């Protein structure tokens, strides 16, 4: 029985060794899957961040164009108003001077 017992023990040791190898391969496979998942998640995050950055720059550019257009329109309105005031003052300056002279010279 000693040989049979040794043979049984050897089979158990071999089975344990095979089981350890299977468990180790499973751990390595799991570790590799986790690494791959992390890399994939990082790639997706970077891709999403890049897309959102591009969208932000596009909307910022559009807003800048709108603000520039509004600023140009405001400047034109101010210039038109000043030109109108200038024209009006040139037209009526003689009348204003005459009115002032009339009031100051005609003392009652």
From Swiss-Prot:
Q: Which Pfam families match?
A: V-ATPase_G (PF03179)
Listed Basic and acidic residues bias regions: 48-60
Question: What does UniProt give as GO cellular component?
Answer: cytosol; nucleus; vacuolar proton-transporting V-type ATPase, V1 domain
Description of how the protein assembles with itself and partners: V-ATPase is a heteromultimeric enzyme composed of a peripheral catalytic V1 complex (components A to H) attached to an integral membrane V0 proton pore complex (components: a, c, c', c'', d, e, f and VOA1).
Report the family membership: Belongs to the V-ATPase G subunit family.
What PANTHER family does this protein's entry cite? V-TYPE PROTON ATPASE SUBUNIT G, VACUOLAR ATP SYNTHASE SUBUNIT G
What is the protein named? V-type proton ATPase subunit G
Q: Which organism is it from?
A: Schizosaccharomyces pombe (strain 972 / ATCC 24843)
């Amino acid at each position: 029985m000693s040989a049979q017992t040794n043979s049984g023990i050897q089979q158990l040791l071999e089975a344990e060794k095979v089981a350890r190898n299977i468990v180790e391969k499973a751990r390595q496979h799991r570790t590799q899957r986790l690494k791959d998942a992390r890399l994939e998640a990082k790639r997706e995050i970077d891709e999403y961040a890049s897309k959102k950055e591009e969208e932000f720059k596009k909307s910022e550019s559009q807003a800048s164009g709108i603000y520039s257009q509004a600023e140009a329109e405001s400047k034109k309105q101010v210039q038109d108003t000043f030109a109108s005031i200038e024209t009006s003052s040139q037209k009526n300056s003689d009348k204003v001077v005459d009115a002032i002279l009339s009031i100051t010279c005609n003392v009652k």
